[in-house]
Structure formats: C-alpha cells, structure tokens
Curated annotation (Swiss-Prot):
The gene is KRTAP19-8. This is Keratin-associated protein 19-8. Keywords: Keratin, Repeat. Interacts with hair keratins. Belongs to the KRTAP type 19 family.
Length: 63
C-alpha cells in the first residue's frame, strides 16, 4: 500500500496513481475530498482511493 500526499493549496488534489495524476484527480478534489469517494472519474462512484485527514492535511491512501 502506497500513500500519496494530496494536500495542495488547501484544496487537496489527489495526485498519484496511474499516469501521475490521471486516476488520482477525482480522489481528493474540493467537496469530493470531504465525502471520501472517487478516483479519477470526476470523483464519482469509484473508491480506489480514499482521502485521510491528519491535522487538516489530506493524504490519499491508494489501494
């Protein structure tokens, strides 16, 4: 299991995954970060990454 640091300017882009930040984009972007779903496809449906919170910093746990 690898962890990618998704904190970026307060929004938290979920980079990491396939092709750098292709699949990782939907995981940890805006309100989708707070909901904790999505991986790549606009943050809908898929749950292959989940953002975790540590002191306000988002970490995307890539499974």
């Amino acid at each position: 299991m690898s962890y990618y640091r998704s904190y970026y300017g307060g929004l938290g882009y979920g980079y990491g995954g396939f092709g750098g930040w292709g699949y990782g984009y939907g995981c940890g972007y805006g309100s989708f970060r707070r909901l904790g779903y999505g991986c790549g496809y606009g943050g809908y449906g898929f749950s292959c990454c989940r953002p975790l919170y540590y002191g306000g910093y988002g970490f995307s746990a890539f499974y």
